[in-house]
Amino acid sequence: MSNIYDSANELSRGLRGLPEYKTVKAAKDAIAADAEASKIFTEYLAFQEEIQKLAQTGQMPDASFQAKMEGFGKQIQGNSLLSEFFTKQQQLAIYLSDIEKIVFEPVSELLK
């Protein structure tokens, strides 16, 4: 029987080999090479982290967060590098969602 960690590492290597992963990586590299896109991306990630911290403490984002999110949405849609990155990331997320279902199936069976 193979070691479960070996299987997980093999899965990780497999994900990195997917064309969708490589496309997302290339899109992220393009963002890193562009000062404006990189700045917006970094600010967006910090904002997402702030929202996650609120959620973890049971707090709800207020109206200012909604306005800020809308602002980021406009900035992302207005920047072709960022827009492409998030589109490609969504395509990769389909694989991740499918894998998550497979991996957690044994756990969900225990809860039935």
Curated annotation (Swiss-Prot):
Sections of the chain in a coiled coil: none
Lineage: superkingdom: Bacteria
Disulfide bridge map: none
InterPro entries associated with the record: Com_YlbF, YheA/YmcA-like_dom_sf
Protein family (similarity comment): Belongs to the UPF0342 family.
Name this protein carries in UniProt: UPF0342 protein SPT_0901
Organism: Streptococcus pneumoniae (strain Taiwan19F-14)
